[in-house]
Every structure is written in C-alpha cells, then in structure tokens.
Amino acid sequence: MNPYIKQFPDLMSGKKIMYVHGFLSSAQSGTVKMLQELMPNATLVAEDIPVHPEEAIEMLQKMAETEKPDLIIGTSMGGMYTELLKGFDRILVNPAFEMGNTMSSMTGKQEFQNPRKDGVNELMVTKGLIKEYRDFTERCFQNITPEEQERVYGLFGDEDPVVHTFDLFHEHYPQAIHFHGEHRLIDKVAFHYLCPVIRWIDDKQNGKEQIGRASCRERVCHRV
C-alpha cells in the first residue's frame, strides 16, 4: 500500500476530483490511476480534451458546472486550462501558460501518448494551431480576485525542461511552490508535494485548523 494512503486513508473522502490532462495525453493517462490510488475514497473524473483550445475550454467549463468537483487538478496544458476554471479549489502542476512557445518546436505529426475515446492516435501541429494557443493563453490571469488567489496552488518542478512559468504564475497567485523534479507528475512528486497540498485543501474544506501557509511551503519545498 502507498505509504501516504496508510497515513491519510481518508484524503478527500467522499469528494470529487476533476483531472485535466496535458498536451498529447488523454483521460487514460497513468496520472489518473495514480491519483485514484492516492485518494481511494474519492471520485475521480476525467475526459479527453479537444485539441482546439476554444472547444477545450467550452467542454471543461461545462464539465466543471455539471460535475461540481471539490478540487480540480491540471497538469501542463491542463494546468493552463485549470487556471481559467474559476470558482473551484485548484492545483496547477507545471502549468503551460505559454503553450504557443512550447509547441513551436513540435510542428509536424505528433502521436498521442495515451489512447483516446475518439480513436485518434496522432495530431498535426501546424502554425495555425500554434497561433490558436498563443492567442488563447492571453486569457489567463484575468479578473483574479483575492478569493481566487486563496483557491489556487501552483507546483513547479525545479528541473522542468519544458515549462518555465513559476515567475509568471507568482505575479498573480501567492501560493507558488517549487518541488524537486521535472515536468511529469511521477509518483514521488505526487507523494511528497502534491498530496500535502491536497490535504491542506481537504482540511480547509472540512473546517480543520490550518498551519501557516509559509511553514507549509517551507516543509513541502524541502521534502526529498
């Protein structure tokens, strides 16, 4: 059994978590299985995200309104979309707020890393698609209230070779945390860094006493 489950078996118990996957991934991502294992008493919902950003955000907003999740977790591109899903507690892991730039070196045929319900297994990254994302990401960080700042956490790998948006995020949200790791949300990162943040959110939702955020950050950032 995962040691975190032994220590906190009721993490998000009875609650619903919505997961928003990254670029070239799907709802069949191994991250979905990992999150479900970490929170066995929670309901995890995830769907394949459309390739075009306008279609994607429309689908995600409708999904959030329908599912009414207690927490939304987004990784990479999914973290970028998650920032826009206001009104919910949210965790953004290595959010790709500069998708246009990130995709600029990926032009041409790309294969999806996980199977999708629509059966599509490859994607053509064109200059037009890159422009769609570059234009779309200008919507990020709009109309942020103090209440929203309290509901959003950002986790950023200190050795991420793909995304470098810590400073950009921290300009708008105070709860920005560096972790020792790269771009992918692997088990070790989830155990040492993501789960403690989920627990803070869970405790806050349950009305339990919280330790100071500064000490929280310090404890997480120095976990090995």
Pin down the residues of each PLM region.
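Single conserved hydrophobic/aromatic residue that forms the stacking wall/gate
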Residues: 211-224
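Short beta-strand-to-loop junctions in surface cap/lid or active-site-entrance loops
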Residues: 2-13
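The alpha/beta-hydrolase serine catalytic core
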Residues: 89-209
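Residue in the alpha/beta-hydrolase core beta-strand immediately N-terminal to the catalytic nucleophile
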Residues: 70-73, 89-91
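Active-site catalytic motif of lipid deacylating hydrolases and related acyltransferases
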Residues: 11-66, 183
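Gly/Ala-rich beta-loop-alpha elbow adjacent to hydrolase catalytic centers
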Residues: 73-83
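Short hydrophobic segments within beta-strands
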Residues: 19-23, 73, 155-157
